[in-house]
Amino acid sequence: MTLPSSCAPLTGISRARLPAWALPDGWPTRANGEPLLADLAFRDGRIAALTPTDQPTPGLWDLAGALTLPGLVEPHAHLDKTFTIERCRPTQAGLLAAIHAMHEDRRHWTRADIQRRASAALARAAANGVTHLRSHVDWFTADAPDAWQEIARLDTGGITLERVALVPLPLFQDPVEAEAIARAVANSGERCLLGGFIHSSNWDAAAMENLLCSAARWDLDLDLHIDEELSEVSQGLTWLADHLSRHPFPGHICCSHGCALAAGSDEQAAPILRQLAAHGVTLIALPMTNLLLQDATFGRTPRQRGITLLHEAQAAGVATLLGCDNVQDAFCPAGSYDPLDTLACGLFSAQLSDLFDQQSRLICDRAALTGSPADAAPFAVGATACVVIFPGSDRFIWPLNSAARLVVNHGRLTHRRVWQEEMAHES
């Protein structure tokens, strides 16, 4: 494959192997059922045409059948905590011990420290092909922390960045305080959401009511850390499903984690998933961190996986995504800002199949994250010309052995990652 200049805008790509889920209805297929290759024409950084093809088209960059995805989505990160593992190691296993270690590390969170770590995370994500990233930011009081504004000031390197105020549920106990938090988030500018940490250790139904009501009044979407535990008595998702059946929420809701669904029975989970589907709620699974933190005891092999019910959610019609969650901090000492690593983890932990043609949607589906119908067709005419090309892979091995990639953002080749220079990139 001949590489084009990284400076000049591309006119388009030819003979790209796109995933079946992202193609329009009626797209032609080969005898073996695979979709026909595609031409994508670009104009002014956007897609001007999508057409099936068998032959290279003059004037377009010929990919010769290389696997090609839309820009990748990172639906759940923590830019305020990232890259702190060298100074922040929990003394016990599990989620609550990691939270305690994180609080101990906060004394180091100067503006310069946050800017340095978060900028490095965004640079890695961009080099891996991420074009949309949502970061939760911890709020410790009703006032916005320094990290909230510091992350807003970052040079995102072509990534659309969203911020979620991650607020402990008890801070919503007082309706006046709940209103003040929601107002502060709403006044923070575009792409800001309200969130909450909802766990059996801090459960409060009245606070949940205040959280949803204040978000609705201020026209805020929600992204909740909810039921991040393997407990049959956790109440977050059960309460939310029942509440939505009586009081539909006007915005979009994402529920991150949901590990407790895997601790109960199928009969308990089914009505919850039906309600989530009926109200357009998205379920975000976070396999790397949940595998490390759930059923965790030092010196003991875990018996439970800690992954939410991905297959059952998909069967019920719930939109689903996979996220990296924590990267190199007290919650997850490893991790990366490469969604392919997350999907590979999901492949084994959740026993996913048909990875490229169907489950790649878990790391690309902006509509599932935002709730916006405008994001539903990534290759539609008028969509931004953002693609990630995997020249050395095939649909049977992908996402493994697929570190080499080429990133096109708004119609320009922005990053090149090859085997010999694994993290090299050109801008």
Spans of model-derived segments:
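Alpha-helical scaffold segments that flank or form the walls of functional sites
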Residues: 68, 85-136, 142-156, 180-186
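Active-site core of metal-dependent hydrolases
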Residues: 166-175, 187-305
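Divalent metal-coordination and catalytic microenvironments
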Residues: 40, 45, 65, 76, ...
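His/Asp/Glu-enriched, well-ordered alpha-helical/loop segment
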Residues: 242-253, 304-390
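Histidine-centered catalytic micro-motifs
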Residues: 70-82, 137, 221-230
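N-terminal metal-binding scaffold of metallo-dependent hydrolase/deaminase domains
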Residues: 1-56, 394
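C-terminal cap of metal-dependent C-N hydrolases
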Residues: 28, 361-363, 378-427
